[in-house]
Amino acid sequence: MTDRYILAVESSCDETSVAILKNESTLLSNVIASQVESHKRFGGVVPEVASRHHVEVITTCFEDALQEAGISASDLSAVAVTYGPGLVGALLVGLAAAKAFAWANHLPLIPVNHMAGHLMAAREQEPLVYPLIALLVSGGHTELVYVPEPGDYHIIGETRDDAVGEAYDKVGRVMGLTYPAGREIDQLAHKGQDTYHFPRAMITEDHLEFSFSGLKSAFINVHHNAKQKGDELILEDLCASFQAAVLDILLAKTKKALSRYPAKMLVVAGGVAANQGLRDRLAQEITHIEVVIPKLRLCGDNAGMIALAAAIEYDKQHFANMSLNAKPSLAFDQFPDSFVIN
């Protein structure tokens, strides 16, 4: 049997990444050019800065990924690319590069939803068992997804306002922590106690929706009022209280989803899946079903996860033509108009 190699491109936000996947789940390379240092002084991602950085490094990422994998363009079977959701300028850089490379090398083009990539990152460590439930937690999304079979995604719950990763970064900015703040908040939380008892929005309601704007506002008010009065703030307790509220909400909604859908596996993915507090709570509280979380290197944005999702689309011959465009607000159940089904 001839080996299959997929080159994947990810540029939806502030990471430029190109990866090579061999067959179903073997990542031969996963080159990531991070822009975190460039965005730190702004306290968040600046879209124009992100796009310019993608342009500067993407060609080098292609070269490095092929070299690290030990293959050439002639060995490839397809090119995959994130076409949404994300920052439109950033997406267009990756799309242009992927389409040009695919066209020049006479390779089929596979469009991949960025969030499907996060979900399928777990395929690298073990085969996924269907049907499954996925909790996707990142800087831009918080979603519960029911996946009855590979490539078939149904959103059953999502945030009504802030994504959980966004809330982490916003409260981190209030405390003067370095962007991105999630890791530092997690570390501080392990040293503190839940003394502030922040609200857990909609935690007892029957639906599977999330809300973090009220929690964020409550945190900011506590911090602001203490500063105004000159009261002492214990950062460890602030972080522990914030994280306890976040995790209570995530766990409560995930448990409800598992009780309502016939899942054989729970996948937790996205940048916030790197949070040690979340991993600990999942291990303690969800024991009746297998929980799969991608390795830390695959939790953030990377092309490896895009390649892993693309392998499923390749099997279905879900290719796109060269009119494929960026979809910054792409939904999970939305497919490109340019699909060419062979």
UniProtKB/Swiss-Prot annotation:
Catalytic activity: L-threonylcarbamoyladenylate + adenosine(37) in tRNA = N(6)-L-threonylcarbamoyladenosine(37) in tRNA + AMP + H(+)
Binding site for substrate: L136, V137, S138, G139, G140, D169, G182, D186, N275
Chain positions recorded as Fe cation binding sites: H114, H118, D301
Cofactor binding note from Swiss-Prot or TrEMBL: Binds 1 Fe(2+) ion per subunit.
CC cofactor: Fe(2+)
Main location, first listed in the record: cytoplasm
GO biological process, one term: tRNA threonylcarbamoyladenosine modification
GO molecular function: iron ion binding; N(6)-L-threonylcarbamoyladenine synthase activity
GO cellular component terms listed in the entry, alphabetical order: cytoplasm
Record keywords, A-Z: Acyltransferase, Cytoplasm, Iron, Metal-binding, Transferase, tRNA processing
Keyword Iron in annotation: yes
Enzyme class: transferase
EC number: 2.3.1.234
Family annotation (SUPFAM superfamilies): Actin-like ATPase domain
Subcellular location: Cytoplasm
Main function: Required for the formation of a threonylcarbamoyl group on adenosine at position 37 (t(6)A37) in tRNAs that read codons beginning with adenine. Is involved in the transfer of the threonylcarbamoyl moiety of threonylcarbamoyl-AMP (TC-AMP) to the N6 group of A37, together with TsaE and TsaB. TsaD likely plays a direct catalytic role in this reaction.
Family: Belongs to the KAE1 / TsaD family.
HAMAP family in UniProt: TsaD
Protein name per the record: tRNA N6-adenosine threonylcarbamoyltransferase
Organism: Streptococcus pyogenes serotype M18 (strain MGAS8232)
Organism lineage: Bacteria, Bacillati, Bacillota, Bacilli, Lactobacillales
